[in-house]
Design a protein with these regions (language model features):
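Ribonuclease/tRNase effector modules and their secretory precursors
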Residues: 1-97
């Protein structure tokens, strides 16, 4: 399970993310379907490890910040990749020799 809006504030946060970055947390779940997605540790907040997922959805590169709680990926935010983040994605998924 990736995203559940169990609490009203989760649905609100998803809507705010869509208004700000053009993608809500429901659509963002598709980022985990990309076989070429990169997951890297991002930082630690209040002893909780946060990860960055760099992935493509509808031919656009996104970065999702998330954490794992009780076997559920809790999405914190999602936005379009910056140029250097997209280059890292492309570099890691470039042609294989």
């Amino acid at each position: 399970m990736i995203y559940r809006a169990n609490k009203p504030e989760e649905a609100i946060k998803s809507q705010i993310n869509k208004e700000k970055h053009g993608i809500d947390f429901v659509d963002a779940q598709n980022l985990w379907r990309d076989e070429n997605a990169l997951i890297i540790p991002a930082n630690i907040v209040d002893e909780e490890i946060r990860y960055a997922l760099i992935s493509k959805f509808q031919n656009k590169c996104y970065i999702a910040i998330f954490t794992l709680r009780s076997d559920i990926y809790r999405i914190i935010s999602v936005r379009r990749c910056r140029k250097n983040e997209e280059k890292n994605y492309e570099k890691d998924n470039g042609p294989r020799v």
